Every structure is written in structure tokens, then in C-alpha cells.
Swiss-Prot record:
GO terms for molecular function: magnesium ion binding; nucleic acid binding; RNA-DNA hybrid ribonuclease activity. The gene is rnhA. It comes from Shewanella sp. (strain MR-4). Mg(2+) 2 binds at D12, D136. It catalyses: Endonucleolytic cleavage to 5'-phosphomonoester. Endonuclease that specifically degrades the RNA of RNA-DNA hybrids. It is found in: Cytoplasm. This is Ribonuclease H. Disulfide bonds: none annotated. Pfam families: RNase_H. One of its GO terms (biological process) is DNA replication, removal of RNA primer. SUPFAM superfamilies: Ribonuclease H-like.
Length: 158
């Protein structure tokens, strides 16, 4: 069996107003090469952007990889490493028997993660971590660029 490529991925999400215009930022490092990605949406939430960032990054990988994925989102990290197992057993319901929020993105993240060996790491945001700060800049710039793209899965709280 061949050795899997080791990719370092850093992600962040941003939202102005929450809900409001939002964006995500991604920095990917592989053997000294860096790739940056970002995009914005007209109306979304911070949590949706925190989920979409790792989804886009993982879906961009062309083959199974060993991934160290670092984010400042406890919501995303806790969800994908801990909460998701219970949600799936309960038919995507929370322990309070309410539907899981952002279920479209959780399902997509779960599917994207299955293809890779991922070490999910957390870093404190706005604490001088270079790649996280760059992701924050990319995400904020995407949110501030008057995005027109629609976040199809966003549903306003009723």
C-alpha cells in the first residue's frame, strides 16, 4: 500500500451580522506548496461558513490523504468528532429530539471526511496563529465583497 500524502488544511468562517453576508477561507499546505481558497454568500451564518470551509477543502483533494485539519471552530470540531455519532443514530436529531441545525452541511462534511484519515485540531482564534489569521482574512474579505451567491441550505430561524 502506498503512503498517503500529508496535507495540512486550515479553515475559518466569517459572517457579518450572523445571519448576514458570510464567507469562508482555506489555506492548504502540501510539501511547501500553499493553495488558498475563499468564497462568499449573500445570507448565511457563521456556523455554516465554519462547516463549509472544511467541506470545500476536503472535496478539493483528488485522492485519499492523511489530513491535519486545523480550525478555530469548536462547533465544527466537536460536531464532526463527537456529536455526529449520536445524531446519525437518532436519525439526525439532537438529544432534545429537535432536528440538527445545518444538517445538509453536516452530512456533506461526514461524507467528505470518510475518504481521508483526518486529525481534527483546534486553535484559538485571533491568537497570532499565522495560517488561522490568513484564513480569517480570506473569509472576512469574501463576506465583505458584497457576495451575491445564495447559500441554498440556509434557513432563517422561525
Amino acid at each position: 500500500m502506498t503512503e498517503l500524502k500529508l496535507i495540512h488544511i486550515f479553515t475559518d468562517g466569517s459572517c457579518l451580522g450572523n445571519p448576514g453576508p458570510g464567507g469562508y477561507g482555506i489555506v492548504m499546505n502540501y510539501k511547501g506548496h500553499t493553495k488558498e481558497m475563499s468564497d462568499g454568500f449573500a445570507l448565511t451564518t457563521n456556523n455554516r461558513m465554519e462547516l463549509l470551509a472544511p467541506i470545500v477543502a476536503l472535496e478539493a483533494l483528488k485522492e485519499p490523504c492523511k489530513v491535519i485539519l486545523t480550525s478555530d471552530s469548536q462547533y465544527m470540531r466537536q460536531g464532526i468528532t463527537t456529536w455526529i455519532h449520536g445524531w446519525k443514530k437518532k436519525g439526525w436529531m439532537t438529544s432534545n429530539r429537535t432536528p440538527v441545525k445545518n444538517v445538509d452541511l453536516w452530512k456533506r462534511l461526514d461524507k467528505a471526511a470518510q475518504l481521508h484519515h483526518i486529525d481534527w485540531r483546534w486553535v484559538k482564534g485571533h491568537a497570532g496563529h499565522a495560517e488561522n489569521e490568513r484564513c480569517d482574512q480570506l473569509a472576512r474579505a469574501a463576506a465583505e465583497a458584497s457576495p451575491t451567491q445564495i447559500d441554498e441550505g440556509y434557513q432563517a430561524e422561525s
